């Protein structure tokens, strides 16, 4: 439970739009618990402001990735869950990115440079605003850390990331599909 890196997150309170991008190498299949990848924490909630994790899926090299977000902006308060299965992703270095564009209300997920899911959050969702920060967690869930970064303790069904993570990037804008593909092609 203490296998994580914690960073102060006060610089991302009002991201508005964002892109989270990283390379990951996790042995497949993912079993034994949901593996935390990244969290922008919320110290007063079970789930963070933004969470990305691998869900259990006993299907060889297919990744089951979930993205949770909660927006605290004026008219756009709301929790959102997005999930995607990406074939031929595990047991090798693979690239993942999620973008959110506040102007269009669109969230887009990418696997290995290709758009794999686009979700309309709606323009009422608006610019992203996060609250009650307790840092950024890399390689685990916010509630699995010691000390915990949430209002809750560890859960048996949740695990630290079993694998390697590289080139984690946070942008304060939604990168275009071409820019995401460039990150993948240039191994950034």
Language-model regions: role of each:
Residues 68-95:
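Short, aromatic/His-centered strand-loop micro-motif at the edge of beta-sheets
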Residues 35-71, 125-128:
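Glycan-recognition/cleft segments
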Residues 20-26, 38, 96, 138, ...:
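Short hydrophobic/aromatic patches on beta-strands that form ligand-binding or substrate-lining surfaces
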Residues 120-163:
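Flexible glycan-contacting loops in extracellular carbohydrate-active proteins
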Residues 1-18, 80-86:
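Short surface loop/edge beta-strand patches of beta-sandwich-type extracellular domains
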Residues 23-29, 40, 55, 98-103:
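Solvent-exposed strand-to-loop "edge" motifs in beta-rich extracellular domains
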Residues 92-100, 109:
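Short tryptophan-centered beta-strand motifs in secreted/extracellular beta-sheet-rich domains
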Residues 164-188:
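Extended recognition patches within non-cytosolic domains
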């Amino acid at each position: 439970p203490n296998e994580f890196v914690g960073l102060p997150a006060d610089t991302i309170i009002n991201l508005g739009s964002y892109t989270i991008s990283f390379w990951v190498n996790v042995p497949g299949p993912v079993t034994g618990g949901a593996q935390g990848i990244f969290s922008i924490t919320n110290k007063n909630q079970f789930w963070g402001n933004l969470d990305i994790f691998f869900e259990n899926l006993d299907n060889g090299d297919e990744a089951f990735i979930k993205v949770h977000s909660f927006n605290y902006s004026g008219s756009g308060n709301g929790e959102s869950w997005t999930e995607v299965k990406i074939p031929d992703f595990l047991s090798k270095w693979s690239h993942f990115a999620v973008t959110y564009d506040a102007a269009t209300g669109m969230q887009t997920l990418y696997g290995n440079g290709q758009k794999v899911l686009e979700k309309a959050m709606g323009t009422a969702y608006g610019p992203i605003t996060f609250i009650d920060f307790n840092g950024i967690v890399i390689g685990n869930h916010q509630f699995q850390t010691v000390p915990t970064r949430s209002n809750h303790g560890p859960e048996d069904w949740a695990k630290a990331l079993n694998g390697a993570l590289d080139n984690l990037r946070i942008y304060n804008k939604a990168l275009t599909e071409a820019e995401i593909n460039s990150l993948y092609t240039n191994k950034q």
